[in-house]
Structures are given as C-alpha cells and as structure tokens.
Amino acid sequence: MTLLTSSLLLFSLLTSRLEAIPVLEKSPAHPAHSAHPAHPSHPSPGVRILRAPESLVAPLGDEVVLECETSLQPERFEWSHRSSRSQGAGFKYLRTGTAKANVSQEAAISRLRVLVREDTLGEYRCVGWFGPLVVTSTIARLELASTSLVGAQESESPLQWRVAAGNSVLWSCGQQVQSNPSASWSYYRNGVEIKPEFIGTNGNLILSNVSSESSGSYSCQATNPASGERIQLPGLLQLQVTPEQRSLSKSPHLLKGQPSSQEITIREGSSLLLLCPGVGSPPPTVVWSSPDVVGAVKNKRSKVFGHALEISDTRVQDAGTYICFQDNGVRPALEHYIKVHVEQPPQIVRPPWADLTNEGDRLKLECEATGVPSPEIYWLLNGHSSIDDTEAELSNNFLILHSVLKRHAGYVQCFARNRLGEHSAGTLLQVNPKQIQEPRESGGTHRPKPNQGSKQKQMYPPSPPNVTRLSDESVMLRWMVPRNDGLPIVIFKVQYRMVGKRKNWQTTNDNIPYGKPKWNSELGKSFTASVTDLKPQHTYRFRILAVYSNNDNKESNTSAKFYLQPGAALDPMPVPELLEIEEYSETAVVLHWSLASDADEHLITGYYAYYRPSSSAGEYFKATIEGAHARSFKIAPLETATMYEFKLQSFSAVSASEFSALKQGRTQRPKTSTTEEPTLQMGDRDTTTPSHNETFNMSPMLTGTLGGGAVLTLLLISICLCVCRRRSSRSRGNNPNKPRMAELRDDFVPLGNCSPTKQRQRTRHIHITLNPLAQQQQGMEEKNDTDQDAPYYQRPSSYDYDPGLRRMSSSSLRRSQRTLERAGGSNGSNNGNNNNLNQSTETGPVENPGKPGRVLMKRPRLSSRSENLSSGSLNSVGV
C-alpha cells in the first residue's frame, strides 16, 4: 500500500506542469502600498519629556509652580535658569532649597516652586538624568504681569458721532492699552455695564442695528487677568442715533477716529473676528471677500454677521488680505482692507537621526522645522549647547560633528524656537570606541619567533548592550560586534547586577553562540538575548562577556543604569499586525506587517521577531529589526520545506508591546533540476539555487511519459519479487527431507516478506527444543496434517531421521524418554500445560512394531496465523 501511494504521488508530481521559480536577489525594504520618508526612523532612547513646563505670567511677590514629567522615572531631576536681565547669558543650574526656588520630586514628576521677583524672571528648563543620557525639556518663560497705556492723553476729548438708525457702529476703545497677558474688557453706557454682542474683540465694541435707545455716553475698562489690575480708559464716545426717515441719503463712509485699514496678527488655532467700520444712509449692505484666500468666506469655519466675519480654528492658509465692501446704492461704495497674519508655533517635521557611529568619524545631522515666523534651530548634546563644542559646526539646519568623540555618546536634541514657543526632537547617538592595542608587558623591541606571525590578532569586545523591558521580570539585550579582523568569538555570556553596595555580577546559564562568521550589516553583527528572573522597581546594569577561540574572554562596557518599571505604570506600545509570510527561498521567508497608525512610529525603536518550527514546542528563535519604519524583514537560515510559526512585537528602550497574533508560513520546497549543471571553471558563482534556464528545461509531456514508465516498471518488479518469494517458500515447505531445525526457521521467515508497512519488527530470541523421540511418528502426523496445512502458517511436521541428532548427548535422550514414560503411565492420558503455546497436549501409547513400548507426544496445531503472532514464543516447543 505504501509503495503504491508513493508511486502515485511521484507520478502526479512528474506529470504536472512545472515552471522555474525566479530567484529573488534582495528582500524588499518596504511594502509597495506604503509611503515612507526619506530616512529611517530615528532611534529613540525610550525616555522623553511627557509634559514640559509651561510659560507663566504672574505679578511680583506671587509664587508659581513649574511642572515637568518624564516617561520614566529618572535618577534625578535638575532645573536650569536664564535670567531675563542678563542678555546673551547661558543657562545655569539652580541650587534647590533656597528662598527663591524649591524643587520637589514625586516618581517621574518634578515641581519647581519659584517666588516671582525681578531676578527670578526669565527662562527655565527641566533636565532629567538617565545614567549617561540627559533629556532636556523645552523652555518655559516666567514673565511679569503688566498693563499700561500707550500714547494716551488723559485730557483727550470725547468722540461725537451722529448716525442714522439701522447702522452698525464699531468703536475701538482699546487701541491704547498694552497688557500681558491680554486684558479682558468691560463696556459701559451712561455708567451702566452692558454685555457686548461679540466676545474677544480685543477692545472693539460693535453695536449692531442701532436705534434711538442706543444713544448715550460710552466708556470702557481693561482688566489684567493675572494681576487683577484695572485701567479706566479716558476716551469717551458720545453717540446720537437719528431716525432713518429724517436722515439725508449719504454714501457709506467712516466716522471720526475709525481706521481706514487694519492689520491683525493671530495665533494658529485661535478664533479670528474681523470687523468692518462704516455707516451710511440708508444703512449699507456688507459683502466680504479675499483675493488671497480661496473660499475664505464660504467654508465651514467662517460665519458672517453683517459687519463682522468670524473664522474659527484659524490656519496658516487663512493669512492674507480681506476686503469689506459696503454699498447702499449711493455712490461711491466703500472698501475696507484688513491684513491678517497667522503665526504658527514651531514644529519639527524632520527630526535628526543617528546610527551607531565609529569614534573619529564625521557625522552630519539634519533637523527641519516649520513655523511662522521661521524658527531658529539650535542643538544640545547631552544637555550642553553645541556652540561650546569644538568639534561641532552649525550650518543652516545641520549639525556637523567633524570628529565624533566618546563624550558625544548619549542624547542629541534639536530645538526649533520662535516667539510663540519651542519644539524639540532627539536621537540616540551611539559611539563605537576605537580599539586600543594593549601594550606589551616587556619593554624594548620585540623580535617575533620564527613560527609566530608579525601581527597577533586582538580580542575586540562587543558593544555595551541596549536594554529593553519585556515584562515586569525580564528584559531584552541588544549588542553588536563591530567589523574587525581580530580573534573569532565562539560564544557570549550575559552578566548583570543590581545597582547598590556589595552587589555582585550574576552570569546567566545560557551560552549564546556567535553563529556563522559573517557580518550581517555594514557596521558588524548584532545579537539579542533575554534576561529573566529580575525584580521590578529595581535598577540594573548589564554587560556582555565574549569568549574567543583561544579560550580567553573579554567584557564589554557596562550598559547604562536601567530601572525596571512595572508594566502597570507604562503606556501600552503599539502592536504590529502580521500581514503575510512570503516564501522567499528554500531557507528563508519574508515577514510583512503593518501598524494600526503610522503616527505611532515615534514611540517605536524597532521590532522583535520570534519564530520556531510549528512541530516544535521549544523556545522561539529571536531576530531584531531596527527602525520604526520597517514593514518587512527576511529571516534566514531556515529548514527547507518546513512550516514555521511567527509573531512580532514592537519595542523601545522603555518597554515592549504585546505579541501579535501567531501566523504560520513555510519555506519553499527543494527545486529539482533535470539537467546537470556544468562545472564552473573561473570566478565565483552561487550554485545553491538553479537559475531560470537551468531548472526543469524538459517539456512536460516528455517528463510525464518518463515518470509514468518508471512507476509501472517499479510496480511490475515488486509483483514479480513477491510471487517468486512465495513460490520458493512453498517449494521449501514440500521437501520431506528438510531438517527440522531449518523447517521451523523457515516457518516464520515469510512473516517479513511482502509486508504492507515498513514498520520496525521487534527482534525476538528463538529457542527451539527438538524431540528426538518423535521421529517415529512422522508418517502418522504427515497423514493427519496434510489436509489442513494450507490455512496455517505452521508447516507440516516432519520427523525424518536427522543426522544432527547423533550429536545430542545420551543423557538428554534418556531424560526425555523417562519423562514420556511417566506421562504415559498415568492412566494413559494427561493434560499437560504448554507454557509457550497455552494449549493442551494429548499423550498415549502408540503401537509401533519397530519400537515397542515407545510413548509419543502429539504436538497441537495452532488455530490461525494471528494466534501464532500473538503467542510471543512461537519458536519454542515444550516437551
């Protein structure tokens, strides 16, 4: 059955239409359907400022609190200050616990309490220390609350306006007030406060559709919301409203003191209110338009209220000139122009990015930002200004380090700044230090030995590991061995210790093999390993121990201090979704995945890929994928034509995400070539995978014919072998002169022939005991057994004289004879128990003229072949 099934499968395979599978040269970097920026995702240290201190305006003598929060609890917080009285001075770290500044810390939140004085005004920064990493917040300004009049005369005479009923009157009473923060306004008519129709007019009072009841004396008052200071403006408005019927026709015109044009500056995201001054008789109709802004009036964010145009959620594209056109049928019409400027806080759109950099190399970092006015770009290296660094050069939006030094390793931050605020972005700069040759112990010149090379290979240590939290009790380490020509590394060991006094280094039990001596990137070869059984809410350091081919070892530099944060206190990381497992080759697959939102990429440093054969329940193999923009990755080497299961998780230095759903995929099946590949004479060529022209170049019809003929030939040969073996077995069984020993052995040989399954047969020890006295009964048993021989696998018994019996000792013959005589003397019958066959035997006297008095024991016949197989000791005959 097995042979037939295999033959049919081979026949179907050979007769199917086979085409060569093209060989892929390189794994695609990204799926085709996704868009990617010009540079990979910037490596993030995993720690960042979640909440920077905010700018405040307060009066003298008041106490303010500045708050700063980081994503992970730092080792310590510090605050720096730059006074507003010293122009051009740098930031200085504050001494805490003084009368004018006090710092308190609660987990990952730091609070700075400042007493507002002339010397405490200025700019403040929050600085978080995470081992060698320094993360700096954006600037918070502390300013003094103030309100003042600009160019106003206390003896200013009031305005006298006379208008026809039905007009809209605009009075700008707040043009002479300067307030920080912006003042709130109150309006009065005849000494009684009135509620304005529009709020947020910045000191402009608009009276729509005035009537005789609107006549009166108007005044206004400005209040500073921070200090509560109030200023009563000296200017007054005397308004007189006449009935429309009594007014003469007059074209639209401006009243005394009304501006002919306006220029307004507003912050992006605020609400903008444009007011159109002018009156006429009859009251004019107002039409709004803009030659610079398409759809400025007819959109969901704009509303027209006669002489007012309100634009909510102002955007940069709303900047431009707006025209208020007034017409009442009397020429000329009136046009009023309003110039709108929209300011935008700075926003970094292209953050800096840095990879592992060798010490002494040149590094160029770019930082691109938007904002109105155009923001100023400056850089901090681990909290220190790049201006003070002798190796740094600033060129437009670029930071150039002519020679990267060890002190540059850490966090590099780019800041974009304009008068509306600041925005920052950073990257982790890892510096691969130069390898320093160890000096020889003995001084003077060293003459090499005859058998010793002129240059001895060095032991290059691995880089210090980067640490990522996996769970409350485990972390993942990532390190790299830089490209070198030193001694090969055999295995790695991971060591860790808890930070504190008298804490020793612990070594994990796992040996991490180096693998093939092959660099998997331009910088070197990267590795990963996990460390378990750690304690949460404790700080650890890690290092890597490399064991070399000379059985010596060398340690890496220790990692930065890592605080193992409990998972409940961390925000969840975005979980990638495995989309497809592409069969890349016989030994490789390509994973394709996606994120729920590309906006989450700034939270991710890279991905961990886990895989193992689907038939295995062992531990997963791990692979590290650097860069948040990656959407595919090739995993190799794998077993040929093997099903694997895969899962992914994203990670940062703080934590790792939950695992994605398991997805299975297999490697390609082996490609069988029907042509022999010629031997290469010159050059290097990859012969592991046949090319398109070399694979299956025979036609499908010819291939099918040859395959079918081969299968039929195999079937005929198998049938002939089985028939011949069965005939030879029968011919041997019919030979009456065959020795008894050979007959018993042949009885059980056919059990292994023509077996339907190739199961492993259990080896049994054969114990055969011949009855030397049973030969005289040969004729009688042949007569009784001949008719029933076919249904049984046991051959007919033959007791012919065998010359081999002469070799049996006379003592054994006499013992056997006495046993039979005793059995025959017990009333001529006895039911003996055969322990091997578990069947009864019959004994009795048999008359034999040649040998009187001889008692023979008749051997029982087995009922079936299956009973023979289940006996367990078929080749033992009890006498």
UniProtKB/Swiss-Prot annotation:
Ligand binding (heparin): 497, 501, 503, 541
Carbohydrate-modified residues: 102, 209, 466, 557, 693
Fibronectin type-III domain segment(s): 461-567, 575-670
Cystines in this chain: 68-126, 173-220, 276-324, 367-414
Signal peptide: 1-20
Alphabetical list of InterPro entries matching this protein: FN3_dom (IPR003961), FN3_sf (IPR036116), Ig-like_dom (IPR007110), Ig-like_dom_sf (IPR036179), Ig-like_fold (IPR013783), Ig_sub (IPR003599), Ig_sub2 (IPR003598)
Family named by the database record: Belongs to the immunoglobulin superfamily. IHOG family.
Subunit structure: Homodimer. Heterotetramer; 2 iHog chains bind 2 hh chains when facilitated by heparin, heparin is required to promote high-affinity interactions between hh and iHog.
Protein role: Mediates response to the active Hedgehog (Hh) protein signal in embryos, functioning upstream or at the level of patched (ptc).
Protein name from the UniProt record: Interference hedgehog
Source species: Drosophila erecta (Fruit fly)
